[in-house]
Amino acid sequence: MKPCNNIAITPELIAQHGLKNDEYQHILTLIGREPTFTELGIFSAMWNEHCSYKSSKKWLKTLPTKGNCVIQGPGENAGVVDIGEGQCVVFKMESHNHPSYIEPYQGAATGVGGILRDVFTMGARPIAAMNALRFGSPDHPRTRYLVAGVVSGIGGYSNAFGVPTVGGEINFDERYNGNILVNAFVAGIAKKDSIFYSKAQGVGLPVVYLGAKTGRDGVGGATMASAEFDDSISEKRPTVQVGDPFTEKCLLEACLELMELGAVVAIQDMGAAGLTSSAVEMGAKGDLGIKLNLDKVPVREENMTAYEMMLSESQERMLMVLKPELEKQASAIFHKWGLHFSIIGQTTDDLRFRVLHQGEEVVNLPIKELGNEAPVYDRPWSEPTPQPILKVEEVKKVENLGDVLLTLLNSAHQSSRRWVYEQYDTLIQGNTLVRPGADAGVIRVSSNDKRALAFSSDVTPRYCEADPYEGGKQAVAECWRNISTTGAMPLAATDNLNFGNPEKPEIMGQLVLAIKGIGEACRVLDFPIVSGNVSLYNETNGEAILPTPTIAGVGLLDDWSKMVTISGMQNGDSIVLIGDCGSHLGQSIYARNVLNINTGAPPHVDLQLEKKHGQFVRDVIHRGFVHAAHDISDGGLAIALAEMVIKAKKGIKAKLSNRLPHHAELFGEDQGRYLLSIKPYVLNHLKELAQVNAVSLTEIGRVEGNSLNIEGILTLSVDKLTQAYESWFPQFMGE
């Protein structure tokens, strides 16, 4: 064995690798000897939360993953959904939380790079990106630095690669002070008959290394992503990867060309745990062994050890099982794109993962137990104490509700995110129909295609903390609702479950209940989960983040010319409310941000009502009755009306029902509701349709003038609303 493999395996070393004592004892039983240092690193990488899902796998299996349009669900690099005409959309969301807190630019950039590879590994050309970001309190000394670095990193990578960013979300809360969240989403288009998988097949076939050289960046990244932070966080900087979007663009083109050639048997990107994970996953899925020779791996640094090469997370790399008769043509493609193409091993029939380095065998492990048979835990969990319903009469009505509306529009929570998305290229590729800032981003399938895809990403973490089950339901419902506002049929979703330490029963309870809520909503709304990611141990010095189960979804428009957006209001339109008057103030931004009331149950999500209202909204959009649509969520009716006025630059004169106190009707966050701006002459017909479908529809106003005028309560000009809405973020960033 080489010197690095002669390192003594001590209890301290085992603990540094994130392995529990019982896990190490299981390793000893499994292999019948003490592991080498490199083998210890491999077990650490493959058995951590980031790669094995050992705390969440039991519960993830309960999610609905099948549907009429689902081609590939969880278990591959990305989910695959049929969109007709021989095409499919391939998509996934994944976290890069820990690296982005340590090194925000590179952490966020390589998060984008990793999810891009997940998508084009399947044979899809990326067409759209989103990101869901959570930062600490705006007055925390690191927050502005982290926002600037993360946004710059996302823009720097996605813009250079050439994929448009079409949506996303940002939250600020002190519970993210020590652990920010960076969740990146990418979707691509592929042919249904040209999807590529990671399952290796055939014995004695060449295993080929593709892409950039291997360095020491990211060594131990997967293990770091499965641990809490403490005061030694700055020492983890070397575990953050460094990305090169131009190399990734070349890798995309080379891979798609290789796939067109028909040379690919199986392919896997090198993400978390690098060469180790990609090789083990391909072999384990195909019931094959893998033998690698590290002397063949292209490296960019001298004297790299086997441990470093196996656990490096250098970016822009792939591993492929190749049809041997096409080696020459495949090699020529990669060299044409200036990328490395090196045969570093072969598939075997012995179900062993063997690694050679400088003539010696440094790894010899059972591949199935490393891969899809890693330990799975049924961790104890507890339910949170139920929050009482916050009654309307318990919530003070502030005297000047116009000032309240302006305050909320000019806040960290509710202000425009223009400062962020204007740093992203939202129009590259030329197919963007709806840019960020709307309910959902929309992209044409291709330049000469009538079809388009709608994308949204949603979660309300404060709801999830108060009631993880309802919060999980609401994340799905709001995503589904946002897609429906365009007229698109919601097809499927991907999840990104961000939580604290699952070894704490109260945190594990948040995860379990959120998954149950997500599953229930997805079943009722026919919105299957086809891919996803779990990020646990988001804690610093024992302080956990807010539970944040992000849901990103995709919908299909058969004819994008019938699409509507938030900004399409026309003078004289009737404004109608789908759903009842608002009344629920528990966990509302009115209660929290204006009155500092953090108690109370979140709004209940009636999934059957969500389904009925969404179907009705899509139907009337398809009939051509609607000029603009917007869902009602954070901030209730008041914020929704203000946003429509701001986006359309047209006024609305509205009147409340006066059945409830004004602050409840304006700022209640009851779910399953929409605002529609409709052609005035169809109002009576819409009322009849609503009655037939048992849908609550109320005319609450008209599009007129240049102010938001809510009778007897407030009058605010479009300019004043816009100034409040657009000014907070630039001021916060010092501009």
Curated annotation (Swiss-Prot):
It catalyses: N(2)-formyl-N(1)-(5-phospho-beta-D-ribosyl)glycinamide + L-glutamine + ATP + H2O = 2-formamido-N(1)-(5-O-phospho-beta-D-ribosyl)acetamidine + L-glutamate + ADP + phosphate + H(+). GO terms for biological process: 'de novo' IMP biosynthetic process. Pathway: Purine metabolism; IMP biosynthesis via de novo pathway; 5-amino-1-(5-phospho-D-ribosyl)imidazole from N(2)-formyl-N(1)-(5-phospho-D-ribosyl)glycinamide: step 1/2. Part of the phosphoribosylformylglycinamidine synthase complex involved in the purines biosynthetic pathway. Catalyzes the ATP-dependent conversion of formylglycinamide ribonucleotide (FGAR) and glutamine to yield formylglycinamidine ribonucleotide (FGAM) and glutamate. The FGAM synthase complex is composed of three subunits. PurQ produces an ammonia molecule by converting glutamine to glutamate. PurL transfers the ammonia molecule to FGAR to form FGAM in an ATP-dependent manner. HAMAP family: PurL_2. Mg(2+) 1 binds at residues 94, 533. Pfam families: AIRS, AIRS_C, FGAR-AT_linker. GO terms for cellular component: cytoplasm. Keywords: ATP-binding, Cytoplasm, Ligase, Magnesium, Metal-binding, Nucleotide-binding, Purine biosynthesis. This is Phosphoribosylformylglycinamidine synthase subunit PurL. Mg(2+) 2 binds at residues 118, 269. It comes from the Bacteria. The active site is at residues 50, 96. Belongs to the FGAMS family. The lineage of its organism: Bacteria, Pseudomonadati, Pseudomonadota, Alphaproteobacteria, Hyphomicrobiales. Monomer. Part of the FGAM synthase complex composed of 1 PurL, 1 PurQ and 2 PurS subunits. Its EC number is 6.3.5.3. It is an enzyme of class 6 (ligase).
